[in-house]
Amino acid sequence: MKIKILVPIYNDWQSASNLLNDIDNNILDLDHELSVIIVNDASTHDRQEEQKDFKNIHSIKILNMKINQGHARCIATALKYIFEKEEFDYVIPMDGDGEDRPEEIKEFILFKLICDFKRYKNNTPKNK
């Protein structure tokens, strides 16, 4: 099973680094391919290049927004990117500031807590 965790970030790279460490430490016994996609919301603070080998995170990608769009737009952009460019079974959005708890990732996967939605490209139907 392929799981993508998407994390919007604006300037707080230290919290993002802490979150990645927490995610890596909390998915030890999961038998799934877990990747992280960070959405940089046009941060004004430089990101410290930190080369770290994570034992359990399969890959980390950074999507860079050209201008600051806000939290919701970052999530929407990442979801569009994941849908169009990545193979996945589940997507878990997490805040980069540590508000969301990485130890709950297992619960989402084990209990398959999901949200399903339909997207209409042109007009929303009158009867849903």
Which residue stretches match the model-derived regions?
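Short, well-formed alpha-helical segments that are part of the catalytic scaffolds
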Residues: 12-27, 46
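Acceptor/aglycone-binding surface of glycosyltransferases and processive sugar-polymer synthases
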Residues: 65-82, 88-90, 99-128
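Cell-envelope/extracellular polymer assembly enzymes that use nucleotide-activated donors
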Residues: 2-4, 35
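Short beta-strand/turn micro-motifs composed of small residues
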Residues: 7-9, 40
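Short helix-capping segments at alpha-helix termini
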Residues: 27-32, 54-59, 87
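Short beta-strand/loop segment that forms part of the nucleotide-sugar
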Residues: 32-43, 63-65
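A conserved acidic beta->alpha catalytic loop
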Residues: 40-49, 98
